[in-house]
């Protein structure tokens, strides 16, 4: 510690600043661990980002979302085109529910039986960041259906591909329940 004799005050160096920053960071980590991720992120509003309309969806400018839909279903830029399944939409919805049974940190927050839509929140493993996933089951012909999926992060500019990986994983486990026809 140095004292500035002319001004009569203590001069702090970078070591003191670094100590304060380290202390503040340690305090934040302790609060995060003790309070839990859900409570901490809850301070920034609900985890669920709400519903969307696939037909009029406008994608985010940041790379922290992913969209997968049947061919010709909407105008937004797709990350992947979803296949067609040889079952009606209700049966596809039931198979989807079975397929997701093993997903960790996944919570259904809304469901519309008539519109055949559902909304989920899934939290990341390490820090518990919430992502909202909207699902819609659509008829694409007699006894044929497909699925529209939109996954988006609540926090951050980039998700490092996590939302797209989630949708790809979900489509793989759904195909084990109901094999696609095309």
Model-predicted regions and their roles:
Residues 3-23, 31-182:
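Ser/Thr-rich, low-complexity intrinsically disordered terminal regions
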């Amino acid at each position: 510690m140095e004292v500035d004799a002319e001004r009569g005050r203590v001069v702090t160096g970078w070591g003191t600043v670094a100590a304060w920053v380290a202390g503040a960071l340690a305090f934040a980590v302790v609060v995060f661990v003790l309070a839990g991720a859900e409570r901490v992120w809850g301070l920034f509003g609900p985890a669920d980002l709400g519903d969307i309309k696939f037909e009029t969806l406008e994608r985010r400018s940041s790379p922290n979302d992913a969209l997968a839909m049947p061919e010709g279903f909407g105008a937004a830029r797709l990350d992947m085109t979803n296949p067609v399944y040889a079952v009606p939409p209700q049966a596809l919805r039931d198979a989807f529910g079975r397929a997701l049974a093993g997903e960790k940190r996944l919570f259904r927050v809304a469901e519309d039986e008539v519109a055949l839509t559902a909304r989920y929140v899934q939290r990341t493993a390490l820090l518990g960041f919430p992502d909202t996933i909207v699902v819609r089951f659509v008829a694409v012909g007699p006894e044929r259906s497909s699925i529209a999926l939109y996954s988006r992060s609540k926090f951050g500019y980039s998700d490092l591909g996590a939302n797209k990986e989630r949708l790809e994983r979900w489509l793989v486990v759904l195909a084990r329940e109901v094999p696609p026809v095309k």
